[in-house]
Amino acid sequence: MHKKLSIWSVMVSFFLLSSNLSAQNYPNKPIKMVVPYAAGGSADILSRPISIAMGQALGQTVFTESRPGAGGNIGAEFVAKSAPDGYTLLFASLSLSTSVSFAKLNFDPRSDLKAIAGIATLPSVLLVSGKSNIKNFDDLINEAKKSNVNFASAGPTTGSHLFGELIKSRSKTDMAHIPYKGSGAAYPDLIAGRITFMFDVMGSALPQVKSGQVRAIAVTSTKRSSALPDVPTLNELGYPGFDVGTWFGIFAPSAIPTAIQNRLEEAVLAALNTPEVINQLASVMAEPVPRKGADFGRWYLEDTEKWAKLAKEGAVKISD
């Protein structure tokens, strides 16, 4: 018995020593930042300068790798099942919260991923074609009550999908969901009028609105955007509590050593203070919300529970 305990003690000591040595040498090779969304979207745009700034803080290259698909779940699962050595990270967004309730997953992000740091939030805009007869939100709902209306999304269980489902549910109308591989892929059909409406994050939507090709008829934030001061919030339009937006944060496999987790957290928070990242966040109308890992992890679980509650109450139902 004593011999078995002794062997076990040696094994535990060896593991702890190896982990400590690994943390002391970290990072000694490039770090991969997986972006599980389509190229050209807000996550892709924000992840690049943040990765560069993190690399400068760590003294090692941090490069981005796009792994889109299934509303972000393919890339998230890849990271969740990667070695927990700090060399594979996830640049996550809202879909990491919503997928728990609205998608069939082969992993559980709540237990298989560890929050490293929170980054920012970004409001969304409800858009219709610039050529559409729909001039405001009331027009949209009236149209939905008398004819076929559809809406595009950046993919199943993404924010743009669930916001559309929430409008459909609360307006008690029938709206068909048409998923795309990223919001950018949906714009040609929206502009041409083949899609009735869609939600997109402010940074991606604003150039399209300013060009006149699409029309903004509502925003999802609690107050009007300074970039679109004439566009009402959904709260104003009779949809109280519709304060939903897209968040961004960084995660790692859950078994990552604490020392490495702390180094990454410091690097993310340092990156958020660099002029390059500050300017990039401002360019897409994102609000910086730096959060340490423990705080961000708690917030993430609360956000996940919020969507789970909406699913349970039937406030949001996924039709396809």
Task: Say what each PLM segment does.
Residues K81-Y87, V100-A185, L234, W247-Q280:
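Hinge/capping helix and adjacent helix->loop/strand transition within the periplasmic-binding protein
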Residues M1-V10:
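Bacterial N-terminal signal peptides that target proteins for export
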Residues N28-P30, S169, T258-D320:
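An extracytoplasmic/periplasmic, membrane-proximal ligand-sensing/linker region
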Residues S9-S18:
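Bacterial N-terminal signal peptides
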